[in-house]
């Protein structure tokens, strides 16, 4: 099995990877419009045969494990550091009842993290000593690409959401190095993306369609000098896509510039969950919702199918436990694992119940597990932001 690599940078396959997939030749590949292209594996006779294109799979595909990250810095979380660690431990414990969980933690904090997290559920929790700054591994961790018999990790060049010099800035140097260290640990080839972004900005149906907000990707704080068409081509070539459905989003009002994973999500090909702001939500977010609803109502996916959109009402901002401008009261930031969907509950009993019912209808073969994550949400993120899945390698035909 081979994976595409940036021009002039042919990685050395680790022993782990060779044991897992067998010896292979790793050719260099120019980025341009061809990343990733068909992987090539040498046959016993030495002839080369083309393998399917690597692409970003749907999150609903089967996982090998879930990655998370241990909150590291009081300079980021202040007096909420203990509370947010409790939330991370709660989420990790719940997910570990359905699939293995690996939590990266600074070497000096790993022992405390192991004690705090405990053994987890039936699939277990493992603490891996990799330096990090914060918990948002969806954004700074690898975005995985798969094909039959092949897997690679896309490094999306995390730059702290482009917030240097703004009130939203926080340290990110360690986070920016996590993808490389994590992929090395698991023997997965790393591919550098021809754009800058985050995993939370990318939502795919696994069949060639991507949902994305222009505010978070066509933005000079990530991709200066790139037009929307240029960003779209970079996304298509690096994620194995054929269609990008652009939503305007809203820049400058949160640290992510309105990531898609808090706004609209695929529950299946052709089916989208749309976040509907609850009572008390700022008018600017209601306008984003209306614009998004209008675009999705007229959109088709990569296979020409119109989208079926189900609205997921948010809670009443006056009825929830969490407060503050940055508190993310979005049920749409759920996470799908093997056999389960993990979604916040905010204390608005009626809205929490409605979210449960809508997600159970959308995922009838999965358990819907609701969790208290108020400390995480107070930092502007949710369960999806705090997790990243490693998909199972599809079998060869």
Language-model features: where?
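N-terminal secretory signal peptides
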Residues: 1-14, 24-31, 37-38
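The feature marks the mature, well-folded catalytic cores of soluble enzymes
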Residues: 46-397
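Basic, Lys/Arg-rich alpha-helical nucleic-acid-recognition elements, primarily the DNA-binding modules
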Residues: 20
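Sec-dependent signal peptide cleavage junction
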Residues: 36-47
């Amino acid at each position: 099995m081979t994976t595409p690599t940036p021009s002039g940078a042919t990685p050395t396959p680790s022993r782990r990877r060779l044991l897992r997939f067998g010896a292979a030749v790793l050719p260099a590949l120019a980025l341009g419009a061809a990343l990733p292209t068909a992987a090539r594996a040498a046959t016993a006779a030495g002839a080369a045969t083309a393998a399917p294109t690597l692409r970003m799979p749907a999150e609903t595909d089967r996982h090998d494990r879930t990655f998370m990250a241990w909150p590291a810095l009081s300079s980021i979380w202040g007096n909420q550091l203990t509370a947010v660690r409790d939330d991370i431990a709660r989420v990790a414990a719940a997910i570990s009842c359905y699939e293995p969980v690996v939590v990266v933690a600074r070497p000096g904090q790993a022992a405390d993290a192991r004690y705090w997290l405990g053994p987890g559920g039936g699939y277990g929790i493992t603490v891996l000593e990799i330096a990090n700054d914060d918990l948002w591994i969806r954004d700074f961790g690898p975005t995985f690409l798969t094909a039959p018999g092949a897997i690679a990790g896309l490094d999306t060049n995390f730059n702290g959401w482009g917030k240097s010099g703004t009130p939203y800035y926080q340290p990110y140097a360690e986070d920016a190095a996590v993808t490389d260290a994590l992929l090395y640990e698991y023997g997965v080839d790393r591919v550098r993306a021809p754009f800058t972004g985050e995993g939370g900005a990318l939502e795919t149906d696994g069949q060639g369609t991507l949902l994305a907000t222009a505010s978070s990707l066509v933005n000079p704080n990530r991709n200066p000098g790139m037009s929307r068409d240029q960003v779209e081509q970079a996304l298509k070539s690096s994620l194995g896509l054929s269609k990008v459905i652009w939503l305007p989003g809203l820049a400058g009002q949160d640290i992510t510039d309105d990531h898609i994973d808090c706004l609209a999500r695929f529950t299946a090909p052709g089916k989208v969950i749309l976040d509907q702001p609850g009572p008390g939500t700022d008018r600017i977010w209601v306008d984003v919702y209306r614009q998004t609803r209008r675009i999705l109502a007229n959109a088709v996916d990569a296979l020409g199918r119109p989208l079926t959109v189900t609205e997921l009402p948010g809670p009443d901002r006056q009825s929830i436990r969490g407060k503050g401008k940055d508190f993310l009261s979005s049920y749409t930031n759920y996470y799908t694992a093997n056999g389960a969907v993990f979604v916040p509950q905010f204390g608005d009993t009626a809205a929490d119940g409605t979210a449960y019912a809508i997600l159970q209808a959308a995922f009838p073969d999965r358990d819907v597990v609701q969790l208290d994550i108020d400390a995480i949400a107070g930092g502007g993120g949710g369960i999806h932001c705090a997790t990243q899945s490693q998909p199972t390698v599809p079998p060869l035909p």
